[in-house]
């Protein structure tokens, strides 16, 4: 094993991210408490229900601990779907929803519709090429700060963005067999 990556395991599809990391030869550590962050250089925040993830992270003290590590530059983050919502500075229409706020972006929850309107679409990811995106009640990035780079779009809408060591995706790369986006994050994190 080359390294260990944390996967926030409070709610959502954290098991799928663990499997994606395993296929790359990376050990995944479930993170549920602040002490679970010790020694980690990278953390994946999975899809699921963004309000629940935010409330539980706040209740368990993870919100402040993760924010501090990201601001210090000692922790890289990858948020997918609900995880991307939690990373954003602003959640449109939900000003009171708990959020980490480390990604200078405003996101719109469920921007493509409800669960029954979920879909799959081929995307062009900068530096990676074609990538199959699975969109389930997916958010979209409506406003991006100057330091945020768009890596993929669906039409005109940004669906994969990066700011420093923070990567955020509207779609679910863990639900495909394609390891490239997880590998990209590992390289970004130096794992």
UniProtKB/Swiss-Prot annotation:
Gene3D superfamilies attached to this UniProt entry: 3.40.50.880
Molecular-function annotations in GO: glutaminase activity; pyridoxal 5'-phosphate synthase (glutamine hydrolysing) activity
GO process terms (BP): glutamine catabolic process; pyridoxal phosphate biosynthetic process; pyridoxine metabolic process
Pfam families associated with the record: SNO
Keywords, alphabetical: Glutamine amidotransferase, Hydrolase, Lyase, Pyridoxal phosphate
Active site, UniProt feature: 81, 172, 174
Pathway entry: Cofactor biosynthesis; pyridoxal 5'-phosphate biosynthesis
GO CC terms of this entry: cytosol; glutaminase complex
Family matches, as InterPro entries: Class_I_gatase-like, PdxT/SNO, PdxT/SNO_CS
Residues that coordinate or bind L-glutamine: 48-50, 109, 136-137
Catalysed reactions listed for this entry: aldehydo-D-ribose 5-phosphate + D-glyceraldehyde 3-phosphate + L-glutamine = pyridoxal 5'-phosphate + L-glutamate + phosphate + 3 H2O + H(+); L-glutamine + H2O = L-glutamate + NH4(+)
EC number: 4.3.3.6, 3.5.1.2
Family stated for the protein in its record: Belongs to the glutaminase PdxT/SNO family.
Protein purpose: Catalyzes the hydrolysis of glutamine to glutamate and ammonia as part of the biosynthesis of pyridoxal 5'-phosphate. The resulting ammonia molecule is channeled to the active site of PdxS.
Subunit architecture: In the presence of PdxS, forms a dodecamer of heterodimers. Only shows activity in the heterodimer.
Name of protein: Pyridoxal 5'-phosphate synthase subunit PdxT
Lineage summary: Bacteria, Thermotogati, Deinococcota, Deinococci, Thermales
GN (gene name): pdxT
């Amino acid at each position: 094993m080359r390294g260990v990556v944390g996967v926030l395991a409070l709610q959502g599809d954290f098991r799928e991210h663990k499997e994606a990391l395993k296929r790359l030869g990376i050990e995944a550590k479930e993170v549920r408490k602040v002490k679970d962050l010790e020694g980690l250089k990278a953390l994946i925040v999975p899809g699921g229900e963004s309000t629940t993830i935010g409330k539980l992270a706040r209740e368990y003290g993870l919100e402040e601990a993760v924010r501090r590590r990201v601001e210090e530059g000692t922790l890289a983050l990858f948020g997918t779907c609900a995880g991307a919502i939690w990373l954003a500075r602003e959640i449109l229409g939900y000003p009171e929803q708990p959020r980490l706020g480390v990604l200078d972006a405003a996101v719109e929850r469920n921007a493509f519709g409800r669960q029954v309107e979920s879909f799959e679409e081929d995307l062009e990811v900068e530096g990676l090429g074609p990538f199959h995106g699975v969109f389930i009640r997916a958010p979209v990035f409506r406003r991006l700060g100057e330091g945020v780079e768009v890596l993929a779009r669906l039409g005109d809408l940004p669906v994969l963005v990066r700011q420093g060591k923070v990567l955020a995706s509207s779609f679910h790369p863990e639900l495909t067999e394609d390891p490239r986006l997880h590998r990209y994050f590992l390289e970004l994190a130096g794992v």
